[in-house]
Regions:
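N-terminal targeting leaders
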Residues: 2-7, 12-15, 20-192
Length: 192
C-alpha cells in the first residue's frame, strides 16, 4: 500500500514534466520528418539557418537606423531580402553586406524604400502566408515542404527547390489566395 502511494505521488510529481518530454519527442520527430522530406541536404538546411541568423546579426549591428525592418530568408543558399529601409543607398548596402557571406549563392533584394510596416499590415501578411501554406498542403501537384512562403505588404514570395510544374502550381495557388496582390517566384528548378 505504501509502495502504491509512493508511486502515485511520484507519478503526480513527474507527470507534468513528462508531458514536456513527450512534446519534445513529438516536436523533434516532426522536425526530423520535415528535414527528411526536404530536397536540401541536412548540411544545406543547417547552412540556410546559419545564413538567416548571421545576416540578421550583421544587419542589426551594421544598420541601426530607426524605421528599418529587414527579413532574411534563405533556401539552398538563395537569399530573399524583404522589408522596409529608409533609402536606396541602405537597400544596396544591405545587399552588398549579405552578398559577402560565403554561403550565399544568389540574392533577391525585394526591400522597399518605405516606412516601417504597421502591426495590422504585418498581421495581414501572416494571415496571407498561413492561407497560402494551408492551400499548398491541400494541393496534389505541390509538396508543400518544398516551398517556402514569405509575405510582405500583400506580396507573396515563393522559394524552393522544385520542378517547373510544382512551381507553376504553387504560383497558381498563391495568386488565387484572398488578399494576395502579387506573387514573386524565386525558385531553383530541379528539372532544368
Amino acid at each position: 500500500m505504501k509502495k502504491s502511494l509512493a508511486s502515485l505521488a511520484l507519478l503526480l510529481l513527474l507527470g507534468p514534466g513528462l508531458q514536456g518530454c513527450a512534446a519534445v519527442v513529438v516536436g523533434g520527430a516532426a522536425g526530423g520528418a520535415m528535414v527528411a522530406n526536404d530536397k536540401r541536404t541536412l548540411g544545406t538546411y543547417i547552412n540556410d539557418q546559419e545564413v538567416e541568423l548571421k545576416a540578421a546579426r550583421r544587419i542589426s549591428q551594421d544598420f541601426t537606423q530607426a524605421g528599418m525592418n529587414v527579413s532574411v530568408t534563405s533556401f539552398n543558399g538563395w537569399v530573399l531580402l524583404t522589408g522596409q529601409v529608409p533609402s536606396d543607398a541602405i537597400k544596396q548596402q544591405v545587399q552588398t553586406d549579405i552578398a559577402g557571406m560565403s554561403e550565399v549563392r544568389q540574392i533577391f533584394n525585394e526591400l522597399q524604400v518605405a516606412g516601417k510596416q504597421s502591426l495590422a499590415s504585418e498581421a495581414n501578411d501572416a494571415a496571407i502566408t498561413a492561407a497560402v501554406k494551408t492551400r499548398l498542403i491541400n494541393t496534389r501537384d505541390v509538396n508543400f515542404d518544398h516551398v517556402k512562403v514569405v509575405t510582405q505588404s500583400n506580396v507573396v514570395y515563393l522559394m524552393g527547390l522544385v520542378s517547373h510544374q510544382e512551381a507553376q502550381s504553387a504560383i497558381d495557388v498563391a495568386a488565387t489566395t484572398s488578399g494576395v496582390a502579387k506573387v514573386v517566384p524565386a525558385f531553383e528548378y530541379t528539372d532544368q
